[in-house]
Regions:
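Conserved ATP-binding subdomain of kinase catalytic cores across diverse folds
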Residues: 1-93
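Long, highly charged amphipathic alpha-helices
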Residues: 37-38, 181, 202
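Catalytic-core segments of enzymes that bind and process phosphorylated/nucleotide-bearing substrates
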Residues: 81, 85-101, 142-196
Length: 203
């Protein structure tokens, strides 16, 4: 309940829909706090992300909550992940790369501006070491006028990735991605070099 802060697992009139995550048994206790920090970093970088909350619980436990963006007025909002849109198996590292992400974004949204948004997400993931960047962690959502666009960023946090590699590579590189490779990716996104440079420096 946004008025009282009370919550329930049952669908209740007047309540907002949120997802609440707890650390898995094999995860460090601070993973929820780290994801909250990353959510704040996304906002500081001007990247759209859902409202979030961090809960410090008894016995050293914690939880991270994010408001669902696939719900509006109690109804489902059409959404599809990059994996669903392309038919890619997100469990296979390297099945898609960031160029595929840009091109899929252009195909799904029919809006070149959304490719620039997708490029910005790539920059953040590289700069902030989010290597859990598989195709299920990007999505497209339908606006009220029926237009597809990139969803808010979600499941963004520090992740070492499989053997230190990003799940999606940038211009063939998935381990040590350089500024030069990011600028080449910007060309694919039709982002001018000077604009891309400012985006990289800003993040």
């Amino acid at each position: 309940d946004p008025e009282t802060g009370r919550f329930t697992t049952a669908v209740t009139a007047g309540f907002e829909a949120w997802l609440v995550k707890f650390p898995a048994k094999e995860e460090h206790a601070e993973v929820c706090a780290i994801e909250m920090v990353y959510a704040e970093c996304l906002r500081m970088c001007g990247i759209e992300t859902p409202d979030t909350q961090y809960f410090s619980l008894p016995n050293g436990l914690a939880a991270f909550a994010s408001k669902r963006f696939d719900r509006r007025d109690g109804l489902r909002v059409p959404m599809q992940s990059l994996a669903a849109f392309t038919g890619a198996n997100y469990r296979s590292p390297g099945v898609l790369d960031y160029v595929n992400f840009l091109r899929a974004t252009q195909m799904c949204t029919n809006d070149v501006r959304e490719m620039a948004v997708a490029f910005e997400r790539a920059v953040f993931n590289v700069a902030f070491n989010n290597r859990d960047d598989h195709p299920k962690n990007f999505a497209y959502i339908m606006s009220q006028d029926g237009q597809w666009r990139l969803s808010p960023a979600y499941d963004v946090t520090f992740c070492e990735g499989p053997s230190g590699y990003h799940q999606m590579d940038v211009m063939g590189e998935a381990l040590s991605i350089s500024r030069t490779q990011m600028l080449r990716l910007a060309e694919e996104a039709e982002v001018p070099p000077d604009v891309a440079g400012r985006m990289i420096d800003g993040i």
